[in-house]
Amino acid sequence: MSYGYPGQGYGPGGGHHQPPPPQWDGQQQHHHQGGYGYSNPGQGQYNPQPPQDQGYGGYHQQPPQQYQQGSYNQGQYPPQGGYGGPYGQQQQHHQQGHSQRPPGPPPDGYDIYGYPIGSGHQTRNQGSHEIHEIPSGTQQFGHGAPEGYGFQYSNCSGRRKALLIGINYLGQDAELHGCINDTKNVSAFLVENYGYKREDMVILTDDATNPLLQPTKENILRAMQWLVAGAQPNDALFLHYSGHGGQTKDTDGDEDDGYDEVIYPVDFKTAGHIVDDQIHDTVVKPLQPGVRLTAIFDSCHSGSVLDLPYIYSTKGVIKEPNLAKEAGQGLLAAVGSYARGDIGGMASSLFSVAKTAFGGGNEAYERTKRTKTSPADVIMWSGSKDDQTSADATIASQATGAMSWAFITAIKANPKQSYVQLLNSIRDVLETKYTQKPQLSSSHPIDVDMLFVM
């Protein structure tokens, strides 16, 4: 039995849509430190309109196995945008001297910049800075590392899927004004610049008429499972969340500051929040090597909401390693060598520390597998550090999340950047209006001078 098109309601097995949660009483905000979006409520408010695209975000395939009682039916989608759409036209106008994307989807065997995949090209960008190619195959720490440990980059040439979540908390005391706009802006950006298709997107917003497309806790977790189901090496997955975030007391000892980061679904009052550990277990842990997940979280306290252990500064070095996640593994010493290009030092530091701590390579390997390090290629751009709040901005008279706006603006200005260049570009954009500092985190040590793709 199918769930039906938007507005047709549930079929059997789908449950019932929760009524709007009660008003926030203000006591729920004690960890929000003001929360996302406590700007002047009279400035640039977003007045939600009925969705123009009723089929936007419909599931086009079976959800994960445990949800086979029902599936989303695909509605009618708007015309597909090509690489040369409105954003592409703006790029051609503003990007004199920058490498530009071709006017249409890349041919088989070529990346979105027109280079043959695996050609080993290197470019120079932003002065004399060299952007490194994306290596293929398993990346090992070197001889002497725990047997079997490695990770694999994705060249993002495979299938693309996206999950976009925007929650304005309509009618609640802590209502936001830019989150639904964020999903519209990001979806258009992905279609017009990165070859994503609307039928491969799920968009959850609290102005949706289909109860299954409301950003409830159940729907968010189901959609996260759909996003990662069946992912193969070199696939490109994209996860975007714009809404309230906060912190709650850590219960499993994996957070340095004693708090887990959480996101708040629209029905948090009745269903509760979603903790970072659960998000990690749902969208990071199932991924196999070589699968890319790019995530953007535009919320308060979002710096480690995916529980990724490697956090990078604008200089391209690990800034705030989550020691509790990787304690005793020897991985941090190895990563220091990796950043310096010292493969031998990387291997010896990893092996010696792990062997001393755990008595041998096999035991260290088993322990390593239980950490948050992942062989998949998971990258997160977050709108604030864990101790910061995010800004609900008004850009060009349209309410929007500051991080979402800065990410799109930075890439449109120069689509060919390394990871560290893009992190600096995003911060430069934000600094024109805001004090928050976005950050880059990953599931494995990365070469921050490598070309960013998604």
From Swiss-Prot:
It comes from the Eukaryota. One of its GO terms (cellular component) is cytoplasm. GO terms for molecular function: cysteine-type endopeptidase activity. Signal peptide: none annotated. Residues 1-129 are annotated as: Disordered. Keywords: Apoptosis, Hydrolase, Protease, Thiol protease, Zymogen. Belongs to the peptidase C14B family. Involved in cell death (apoptosis). This is Metacaspase-1A. The lineage of its organism: Eukaryota, Fungi, Dikarya, Ascomycota, Pezizomycotina.
